[in-house]
Structures are given as structure tokens and as C-alpha cells.
């Protein structure tokens, strides 16, 4: 007697329909989200294929952003997700995040608030605008105002984060940075600077001047919006 819930394993699908073979023949950019995630999951179970499980995960958490923010414990509550699959998913998403963090603009120079906003929009918007907690970053620049690297300094709550000036000065020293830009997000989606944002920025600017580094700007990332404290003349 056949099992009505039995799903044909992906390895028995027509070759042209298998996620991995599709990626190899057409390229990853042509695969829908569920097929990409199915490649990470590798296997399903007797009741659903890896692609079915992938689609259910994406629907449950609202896409890759929600999946990234989900904890391992939350993933394990999903039927069909064991520790190995949860680890595979979290590792793959973390790799994507780190790629965005480490990518830099070749020969880019940041000399105006508009340059700073453009950089933040390109490298931080997708990463920070849907975060549920405040993340505080610094972008370190060389003597020609070209990006050296960006570093996450702290992660706080949904309404604030604590910044240690010593950690920022340490990064300035390690990279011999001549200038820097502060970047953090407002989980509420409203990038309007608070009094605390302005006060902390001024304190950090004074601290940086003590070691010969210039704090050029502080960019606040909101929901598809950015505010430059330098452009608003708040520094």
C-alpha cells in the first residue's frame, strides 16, 4: 500500500529540475530562494523534500532576513529541522553577512556627508534596516579618506546600545586610521537622531581628536532612510 504523504526524493527528480544541477547549469542568480536554501539543507524526509522544507522555513520566518534573525532554538522547533540542518542554515547566512561587511569600494573616497550616506546605503542598509537591535559600527579611513575596514563595536537592545570609546580608539590605533565615520541603526525605522545620539557623537569626536583622528560623520540607518549628523550640522 502506498503512502499518500510520500514525496519523491530530489535525487529522483528530472535532472533539469534538481536545485544543485540548476545552479551548476544556470548559475545561482537564476534560482528562487527555496531552491538555494534546499541546497544548503541537502535532504528532506519521507514527508517532504528539501525544497519543501526550505519553502516552509522561508514562509515561517518571512524570508532570509527573518531566517537570519531566528535563533537556533527557534529553528529546532520546526518539524524536520535537526541540529545539523540548523547549523548549516545559520552558517550559510552568517557567511553572507560577513561578505557584505568585508566588501569595500575600490578607491572610494568619502569627503562629504553625501559620500558617507551613499556608503552606508550600499553596505549597511540591507544588513541593518530590519535588525531588531541597535548595532554600532565604525568605518575607518586612511589619510585620503578611503575605507580601510568597518568594524562592529557593539550590539544593544531595541532602543539603545552602549559604546566604549576605548574600543573605538583601539581600532583606530590598530589600523592607523586618520579619520572615521560612525554608523548605527534605529530598529524603529525612524533615523531621526536622539539627544543621546548627538551627545555620544560629540564625546567620541573629542576622544578621537586626542589620538589625531577626525570623526567626519555619524550616519543613522532607518527603514530605507539615512540621516547624516554632519549634514544636519549636529557634530
Swiss-Prot record:
Zn(2+) binds at residues 184, 186, 197. Keywords: Hydrolase, Metal-binding, Metalloprotease, Protease, Zinc. GO terms for biological process: proteolysis. One of its GO terms (molecular function) is metal ion binding. SUPFAM superfamilies: RuvA domain 2-like. A motif (JAMM motif) lies at residues 184-197. The keyword Hydrolase applies. Residues 109-235 form the MPN domain. Pfam families: RadC, UPF0758_N. The keyword Thylakoid does not apply. PANTHER family: DNA REPAIR PROTEIN RADC (PTHR30471), UPF0758 PROTEIN YEES-RELATED (PTHR30471:SF3). Belongs to the UPF0758 family. This is UPF0758 protein COPRO5265_1522. It comes from Coprothermobacter proteolyticus (strain ATCC 35245 / DSM 5265 / OCM 4 / BT).
Amino acid at each position: 500500500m502506498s503512502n499518500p504523504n510520500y514525496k519523491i526524493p530530489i535525487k529522483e527528480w528530472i535532472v533539469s529540475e534538481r536545485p544543485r544541477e540548476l545552479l551548476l547549469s544556470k548559475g545561482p542568480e537564476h534560482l528562487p530562494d527555496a531552491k538555494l536554501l534546499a541546497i544548503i539543507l541537502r535532504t528532506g524526509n519521507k514527508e517532504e523534500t528539501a525544497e519543501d522544507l526550505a519553502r516552509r522555513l522561508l514562509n515561517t520566518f518571512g524570508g532570509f532576513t527573518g531566517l537570519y534573525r531566528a535563533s537556533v532554538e527557534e529553528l529546532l522547533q520546526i518539524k524536520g529541522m535537526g541540529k545539523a540542518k540548523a547549523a548549516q542554515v545559520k552558517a550559510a547566512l552568517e557567511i553572507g553577512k560577513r561578505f557584505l561587511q568585508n566588501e569595500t569600494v575600490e578607491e572610494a573616497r568619502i569627503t562629504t556627508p553625501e559620500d558617507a550616506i551613499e556608503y552606508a546605503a550600499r553596505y549597511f542598509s540591507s544588513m541593518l534596516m530590519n535588525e531588531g537591535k541597535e548595532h554600532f559600527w565604525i568605518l575607518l579611513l586612511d589619510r585620503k579618506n578611503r575605507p580601510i575596514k568597518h568594524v562592529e563595536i557593539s550590539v544593544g537592545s531595541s532602543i539603545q546600545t552602549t559604546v566604549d570609546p576605548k574600543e573605538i580608539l583601539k581600532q583606530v590605533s590598530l589600523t592607523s586610521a586618520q579619520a572615521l565615520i560612525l554608523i548605527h541603526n534605529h530598529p524603529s525605522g525612524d533615523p531621526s537622531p536622539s539627544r543621546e545620539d548627538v551627545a555620544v557623537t560629540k564625546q567620541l569626536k573629542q576622544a578621537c581628536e586626542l589620538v589625531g583622528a577626525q570623526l567626519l560623520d555619524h550616519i543613522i540607518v532607518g527603514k530605507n532612510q539615512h540621516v547624516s549628523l554632519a549634514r544636519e550640522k549636529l557634530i
